[in-house]
């Protein structure tokens, strides 16, 4: 029931070698899917070659790029919206890391483009193909930040990630008649190549006293992409080591 043989998957935000996106792509491939990954730079071809999938360059903030991407991929059964990042990982995003009074409209729009418009554009362009699948899967990789909690000086990122959940629920309702399910995963502190020392320390304060691994997010994506998850839609799955259930945190 976990086999994805004969299924075709598109995963966004898979450019970082130690990131969640590449772990998702590898898991889907291992389950038998034909996998396409996308990022904004040519390094996506290196990532794709490493795990034996197809890499395509696209700027998902531009609708025409998304249209061209979908045209290249063709039929799609599984869409994983993983593109996005916090402002600290974007060289242009320093003015997003502020309380709301310090956030310019330009900074707000940039953060929304990076973390919300990418999912909107790609999903909109992929829907005709997903509807033809008859059992399509849309999986949003959001965050506990915004989706469940908040972080000081990250109003743009939190708002965008929370908005992904509203989009997910609307899609779950509207696309059910086509056999499409849509769900979201909310990762907590995950150890990736771009994780800061502060983030790594926070992960050690969870009840499980460690950071999560990209493969632990990828495994859940694999299940959501499979036949076994067919009766689940419009739901959020929290993967944070129990961090959100504790009232007191270790010092």
Describe each PLM feature range.
Residues 2-36:
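Canonical Rossmann dinucleotide-binding motif of NAD(H)/NADP(H)-dependent dehydrogenases/reductases
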Residues 13, 17, 99, 103-105, ...:
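Catalytic loop of short-chain dehydrogenase/reductase
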Residues 85, 98-120, 139, 164, ...:
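Catalytic Tyr-X3-Lys loop
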Residues 86-109, 132, 153-156, 194-196, ...:
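Conserved mid-core segment of classical short-chain dehydrogenase/reductases
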Residues 110-132, 172-173, 177, 226:
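Amphipathic alpha-helical dimer-interface segment in Rossmann-like NAD(P)H-dependent oxidoreductases
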Residues 135, 176, 181, 232-234:
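Short, small/polar-rich loop/turn modules that mediate ligand/substrate recognition or access, typified
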Residues 206-217, 228:
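A conserved structural motif in NAD(P)-dependent oxidoreductases
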């Amino acid at each position: 029931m976990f086999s994805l043989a004969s299924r075709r998957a598109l995963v966004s935000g898979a450019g970082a070698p130690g990131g969640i996106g590449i772990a998702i792509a590898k898991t889907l491939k291992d389950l038998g899917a034909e996998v396409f990954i996308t990022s904004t730079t040519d390094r996506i071809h290196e990532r794709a070659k490493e795990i034996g999938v197809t890499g395509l360059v696209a700027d998902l903030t531009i609708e025409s790029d998304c249209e061209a991407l979908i045209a290249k991929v063709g039929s799609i059964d599984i869409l994983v919206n993983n593109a996005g990042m916090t402002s600290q990982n974007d060289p242009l995003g320093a003015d997003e890391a502020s309380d709301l009074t310090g956030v310019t409209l330009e900074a707000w729009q940039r953060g929304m483009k990076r973390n919300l418009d990418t999912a909107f554009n790609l999903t909109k362009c992929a829907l005709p193909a997903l509807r033809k699948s008859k059992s399509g899967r849309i999986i949003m990789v959001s965050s506990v930040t915004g989706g469940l909690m908040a972080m000081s000086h990250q109003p743009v990122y939190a708002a965008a990630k929370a908005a992904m959940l509203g989009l997910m629920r609307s899609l779950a309702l509207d696309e059910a008649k086509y056999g499409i399910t849509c769900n979201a995963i909310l990762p907590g502190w995950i150890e990736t190549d771009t994780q800061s020392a502060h983030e790594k320390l926070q992960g050690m304060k969870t009840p499980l006293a460690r950071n999560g691994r990209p493969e632990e997010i990828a495994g859940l994506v694999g299940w959501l992409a499979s036949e076994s998850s067919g009766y689940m839609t419009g739901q959020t799955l929290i993967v944070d080591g129990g961090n959100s259930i504790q009232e007191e945190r270790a010092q």
